[in-house]
């Protein structure tokens, strides 16, 4: 993907913790409840990661192995997915599962102890400091701190914004988003790299959120006119099986690379980057076919073991 477009799109990631904050219970929630509700994300991270790790060890091409298997296993366990050359490439996207659990837990702990402002201030400091010296903590703790403010923004937005966003607000937000992406570069949460000027990334992310919320409001209002039923169906499918897709889309791409290699084609990381417009659909289409054809129990068994256990248990009780 062209660098400028990629850097612009990186700011979209902020919408997800914003949604978590938007959906956060108005009266708060206990730490125990958060752990019980969201610990399945950690289980899915390690479960999917271990499957992908085994695939990388036994099936990946040697050109994609830049470091020993033991070092990669350690980085996988510590969620050091920022170390691109020292962790299996098919594990990297899974960092978000672990991060989402950590940020919601951290937010709840700090909010319940009335220390949220301190945590947000520390997160802003990390963003600014990252422009001077790279910061990367195990288990995505640093990313959780830097995104606390985004989660709180989502909660406050729901609480205080009761009218629809206007067109001029959306255009202004888009302009700010574009400008900051051009000035600051991309914002990569996985690596803890927030661009040339860390504080600008926060402004760019807020602008991206406002624009995306406006788009969502327009789509909701004009649903029959804008969203074709076929497009809505595809998006719904990907949404329902998002963890399965997140966990296996690179592995599916790896299988395709293996097939191409068997017929004499040479595929490298440079090739994948240069021909992104071919790489992306070649992973997207097979993944869509998989989520269409595979039964739900199998998809859960391959990606969300706890949900699979609950499904099996409920069927046993019914019988």
Where are the predicted features?
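Alpha-helical transmembrane segments and their immediate juxtamembrane cytosolic regions
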Residues: 1-319
């Amino acid at each position: 993907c062209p660098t400028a477009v990629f850097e612009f799109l990186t700011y979209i990631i902020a919408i997800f913790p914003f949604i978590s904050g938007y959906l956060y219970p108005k009266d708060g929630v206990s730490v125990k409840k958060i752990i019980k509700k969201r610990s399945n994300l950690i289980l899915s991270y390690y479960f999917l990661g271990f499957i992908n790790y085994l695939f990388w060890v036994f099936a990946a091409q040697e050109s994609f192995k830049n470091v020993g298997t033991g070092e990669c296993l350690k980085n996988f366990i510590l969620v050091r997915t920022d170390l691109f050359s020292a962790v299996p490439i098919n594990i990297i996207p899974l960092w978000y599962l672990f991060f989402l659990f950590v940020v919601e837990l951290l937010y709840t702990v700090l909010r319940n102890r009335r220390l949220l402002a301190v945590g947000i201030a520390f997160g802003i400091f990390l963003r600014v400091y990252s422009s001077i010296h790279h910061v990367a903590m195990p288990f995505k703790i640093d990313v959780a701190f830097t995104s606390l403010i985004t989660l709180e923004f989502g909660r406050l937005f729901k609480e205080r914004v009761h009218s629809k966003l206007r067109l001029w607000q959306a255009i202004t937000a888009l302009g700010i988003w574009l400008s900051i992406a051009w000035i600051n570069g991309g914002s990569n949460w996985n690596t803890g790299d927030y661009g040339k000027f860390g504080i600008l990334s926060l402004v760019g992310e807020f602008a991206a959120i406002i624009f995306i919320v406006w788009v969502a409001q327009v789509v909701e209002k004009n649903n029959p006119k804008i969203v074709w039923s076929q497009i809505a169906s595809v998006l719904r499918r990907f949404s329902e099986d998002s963890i399965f897709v997140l966990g296996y889309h690179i592995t599916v791409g790896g299988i395709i690379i293996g097939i191409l290699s068997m017929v004499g084609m040479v595929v490298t990381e440079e090739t994948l980057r240069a021909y992104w417009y071919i790489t992306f659909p070649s992973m997207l289409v097979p993944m869509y076919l998989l989520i269409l054809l595979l039964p739900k129990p199998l998809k859960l068994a391959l990606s969300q073991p706890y949900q699979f256990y609950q499904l099996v248990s409920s069927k046993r009780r019914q019988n």
